[in-house]
Amino acid sequence: MGAFHATTIFAIRHNGASAMAGDGQVTFGNAVVMKHTAKKVRRLFQGNVLAGFAGSVADAFTLFEMFEGKLEQWNGNLPRAAVELAKEWRSDKVLRRLEAMLIVMDKQHLLLVSGTGEVIEPDDGMLAIGSGGQYALAAGRALKKYAGGSMTAKEIAKAALEIAADICVYTNGHIIVEEL
C-alpha cells in the first residue's frame, strides 16, 4: 500500500462505527528512533473527520492543512474534498514532490488519498498505509472475519496495530485510536 517507512495507520468501518489507529514512532533515516509518541491520527472539520498519514511529517502537516481547507470549501463533503485535494496534489509542481499518503474517513466514507491522484474507497471497509500497513491490514481482516461479532471497530483497529508493531521495526506499540 505504499513505500513509506516509519509508521503504520489502520482504519476500519465496522458495525456502523469508524475507527482509525496509528503508532507513535518517528524514525530518522533507517537506524534512529527520534520520537516514540507522535500523533499521526488527527480529527479535522469540527471533529467529524479522521485523517492519518504515513510519510514525511512536514509534508503530512501541509496536506492536513490543505485537506481541512478543502473540507471547509466543500462543507464537509469528504469524497469531494478528497478528490479536489488529489487533483491539486497531483497537478501542482511543488505539491507533487510531497512524500506522504493519507487515509481520511467520516461516518459514511473511508478513503485513501495519494499524490499520484488516487482516491480509493476499499470494498471491505478497511485501509492501512505505511511500513506496517500490510501486517495491520492482514490482522484487521482476520480479526473482522473471525472475531468481528464480538469486537468493536476501535478494538479491531487497536489489535491490528498491536500485531503490526510486533512485526514491523518501524512501528511501535504507542498506539492512538480515534473513533467516530
Curated annotation (Swiss-Prot):
Q: What reaction gets catalysed by this protein?
A: ATP-dependent cleavage of peptide bonds with broad specificity
Highest taxon, organism lineage: Bacteria
Which enzyme class, named as a word?
hydrolase
Where, subcellularly, is it found? Cytoplasm
GO MF assignments: metal ion binding; threonine-type endopeptidase activity
Q: What residues sit in the active site?
A: T7
Q: Please cite one Gene Ontology biological process associated with this protein.
A: proteolysis involved in protein catabolic process
InterPro entries this protein is in? ATP-dep_Prtase_HsIV_su, Ntn_hydrolases_N, Proteasome_sua/b, Proteasome_suB-type
What Gene3D superfamilies has UniProt attached to this entry? Glutamine Phosphoribosylpyrophosphate, subunit 1, domain 1
Q: What Pfam families does the database record attribute to this sequence?
A: Proteasome (PF00227)
Keyword annotations for this protein? Allosteric enzyme, Cytoplasm, Hydrolase, Metal-binding, Protease, Sodium, Threonine protease
Q: Which positions in this protein are listed as binding Na(+)?
A: A165, C168, T171
Q: What is its EC number?
A: 3.4.25.2
How activity is regulated?
Answer: Allosterically activated by HslU binding.
A GO cellular component entry from the record: proteasome core complex
Entry's family note:
Belongs to the peptidase T1B family. HslV subfamily.
Q: How does it assemble?
A: A double ring-shaped homohexamer of HslV is capped on each side by a ring-shaped HslU homohexamer. The assembly of the HslU/HslV complex is dependent on binding of ATP.
**Role played:** Protease subunit of a proteasome-like degradation complex believed to be a general protein degrading machinery.
Name this protein carries in UniProt: ATP-dependent protease subunit HslV
- Organism of derivation: Geobacillus kaustophilus (strain HTA426)
State the organism's lineage: Bacteria, Bacillati, Bacillota, Bacilli, Bacillales
Gene name tied to this protein? hslV
